[in-house]
Amino acid sequence: MISELSINVSQNGGACTYVLTGRIDSTTAPQLAANIHLEGVRELVFDLAGIDYLSSAGLRVFLQAQTTMNKAGGAMRIIHCRPHIQGLFSAVGFTAIMDIA
């Protein structure tokens, strides 16, 4: 299976939203990480409505973004998760340390 990830970014002042579509796996996670620019961002939102697969490599990208936002005093939210993606976040304990809906 060919891994594909579409990344659409919108920024409004200190708020930045990433709308992601496709798969986040060991092939596409580096692409996502390279596209996350947090300088001056106070509120970071990842919209995962279009994500149908998330691997540990993708989880690591979100954990790194959360850590960076915490150190900068900003906020991060992950929204519109499909049930199986929400279940994965819950199973690994991310729902205890991140704002995930």
Model-predicted segments: where are they?
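Amphipathic alpha-helical interaction surfaces in cytosolic regulatory modules
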Residues: 26-97
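Short amphipathic beta-strand starts and helix->beta connectors
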Residues: 1-4, 60
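Short acidic-hydrophobic, aromatic-tinged amphipathic segments that line or gate anion-handling sites
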Residues: 99-101
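STAS-typified acidic loop motif
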Residues: 3-32, 53
